[in-house]
């Protein structure tokens, strides 16, 4: 049952992990998962919600792992940024096939492949009802795509950052290791820091906190969950 006839958010920043796109595959992009996610985003656009997207790159490349093996961290992070561009292009294509207008904006210039990130242009595109996919993270090494999601969310003045994961939200403890772990409905930023709960990395989290950007962590593998979040139904954990 929908509690609100209209969406409670006008503009959102949706953060998808790269792993979410690989579905049951061990690597790469699962076309079925990609198309399902594109359909869920399409539903939001049809509701009149403006959607900014940040996608991770972990399904294609993990810089941290190779850094441990001796690769220069900056090089690894640059490769990771390019992985997010590949995911962004795949998502744009899936959205176009679903008849949704979408643009990819990269934090590093890639002429002929996608647009370079431009704040004013991004706002203009969102207002026109286009989905804007922000690729290549922040454009800087040592910053995660969670940091990019919070940064872009703050820049475009989104109402909320929605972090789509494989778990139902934030638990009091690791639910895999501790069967008594409880799912939290609402948390304050300070609660998360004091209890050291895993929401996102500290740089991203403190950026959101300092700019009073609420975050909702929810399970996107459940069909319809994204729509439920936007319609104001209880789904996942709200941090504000």
From Swiss-Prot:
Allosterically activated by GTP. Inhibited by UTP. Pathway: Pyrimidine metabolism; CTP biosynthesis via de novo pathway; UDP from UMP (UMPK route): step 1/1. Its main location: cytoplasm. GO terms for biological process: 'de novo' CTP biosynthetic process; UDP biosynthetic process. Residues 23-28 are annotated as: Involved in allosteric activation by GTP. SUPFAM superfamilies: Carbamate kinase-like (SSF53633). The keyword ATP-binding applies. Pfam families: AA_kinase. Signal peptide: none annotated. UMP binds at residues 57, 77, 138-145. One of its GO terms (molecular function) is UMP kinase activity. The keyword Metal-binding does not apply. Belongs to the UMP kinase family. Catalyzes the reversible phosphorylation of UMP to UDP. This is Uridylate kinase. It comes from Photobacterium profundum (strain SS9).
């Amino acid at each position: 049952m929908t509690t609100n006839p209209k969406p409670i958010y006008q503009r959102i920043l949706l953060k998808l992990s790269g792993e979410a796109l690989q579905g049951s595959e061990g690597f790469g992009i699962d076309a079925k998962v990609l198309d399902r996610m594109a359909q869920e985003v399409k539903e939001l656009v049809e509701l009149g919600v403006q959607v900014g997207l940040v996608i991770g790159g972990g399904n294609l490349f993990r810089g941290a792992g190779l850094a441990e093996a001796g690769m220069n961290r900056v090089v690894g992070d640059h490769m990771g940024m390019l992985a997010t561009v590949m995911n962004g292009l795949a998502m744009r294509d899936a959205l176009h096939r679903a008849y949704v207008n979408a643009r990819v904006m990269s934090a590093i210039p890639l002429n002929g492949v996608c647009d370079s990130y431009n704040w004013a242009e991004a706002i203009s595109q969102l207002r026109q009802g286009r989905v804007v996919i922000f690729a290549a993270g922040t454009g800087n090494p040592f910053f995660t795509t969670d940091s990019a999601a919070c940064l872009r969310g703050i820049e475009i003045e989104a109402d909320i950052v929605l972090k789509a994961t494989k778990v139902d939200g934030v638990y009091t403890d690791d639910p895999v290791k501790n069967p008594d772990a409880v799912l939290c409905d609402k948390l304050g930023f300070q609660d998360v820091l004091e209890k050291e709960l895993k929401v996102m990395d500290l740089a991203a989290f403190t950026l959101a906190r300092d700019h009073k950007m609420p975050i909702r962590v929810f399970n996107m593998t459940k069909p319809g969950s994204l729509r439920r979040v936007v319609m104001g139904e209880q789904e996942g954990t709200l941090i504000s």
